[in-house]
Amino acid sequence: MKITKLSLATIIALGSISFANAQNLEDAIKNVEVSGTVAYRYNDYEESTSSANANRSVGSYSSNNYKAAINLGVKVNDDVKFNSRIIAGNQDNAGEKVLNTQTEGDENFDVFLSEANFDYTGVQNTVITLGKQGVTTPFTLSRDALGNEATGTGLVATTHMGDMVSLTGGYFNQTNFDNNDSSSTTGGDSQLINVDGSESFAYITGTVAYAGMTLDATYGELQDRFDAYSVGIKGDFTIDELILAPYARYSSLDLDSTDDDNTLWKTGIQANLGIFGAYIAYGQTNEEGGTVGTDASSDSGMDDHWRVTLSGISDASAIYATVDTQVTDTVNVSLNYSGIDAGSKSNSEDQSEVYAQVAYKMSKNLSTYARLGQFEVDNYYGANDDLESTIGRLHVQYSF
């Protein structure tokens, strides 16, 4: 048997290399930021069918909905950071995996990289992001724990001028806007039907914050499709023990293919006093249309509660109202109402929903809620032939 002898110098050298590698690995781990969400939702809708059917209560729909997302941020050097987002869900729209429990079996999820970009912070008070990233504007929804996300490849720069003013400009040479949900699922229609994702998108946003108030204004243009702008204001005030959070926003989207100029304005306020809370909001669209963004749930749209969504509905007004109480530190109970009043030139019908919700926050990063209510749409199947639905939902979400 041959015995190999190692000199003291060799042993010290090998130990130094191992220690250096361990130090590099430790430093690399320290420089990695990890966050994300995991969400599960069960929907159960028992719906009446057309009055032409002998049994009007045979319609029903139930589904399991899943989505998991992990965000990774790695410091490359003092000026550069790499960001990525990995999603397990539906690759088509970076959304959730939906499994109909009545017509489909269990399936595995798509796992894909939805974001991969670099931040450059070498310019004072400025962040420049290059690569595939979320498109963050009032017209889009860039992140959602359970829903589609707007992404694209481009360059975004944000600069801060003191604590009050910031400016952001972005340009994308391609997006996934063709797979976004820009209108209500029960009535109304999106006018962004010819978007294929290859169109370039550019926007500029200015924000001013002062004395508890924040004012923002954004202009965006999707090549050969639309020009849009949105102006919003919100506040946060405390008067003794009363907390008030009012807001208002006006948005307009002008289609290039037609003379239609879609508008939607909305205003609302959240109030909290002790264990009690209340929320009320009102919105309205014009006769030409209510499509004012690529996603119905974006800031420019109005989708405050559950199935009643004003986005994409023309010549209509909506009201959303909630009262709630914090029963314990972990349990909140609320009663919610939503209603849409459609005008004579609307592309939809009157609709309303009322539901109760019990939310339970087991820990800082684990929450769940259960909902049960009633949803109705007038003349859904024809004249005097309404949709009536008993709706239920269970939602569980973990954040890290």
Say what each PLM segment does:
Residues 2-135, 155-162, 208-209, 234-242, ...:
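Beta-barrel outer-membrane channel/assembly domains of diderm bacteria
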Residues 45-47, 81, 93, 139, ...:
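Intrinsically disordered, low-complexity acidic/polar segments
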Residues 50, 95-114, 123-223, 291-314, ...:
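Surface-exposed coil loops of outer-membrane beta-barrel proteins
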Residues 62, 142-149, 174-177, 196-200, ...:
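Solvent-exposed loop/turn segments connecting transmembrane beta-strands
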Residues 87-88, 173, 284:
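A short, sequence-level motif marking secondary-structure junctions
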Residues 209-211, 230-343:
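Detector for outer-membrane/organellar transmembrane beta-barrel domains
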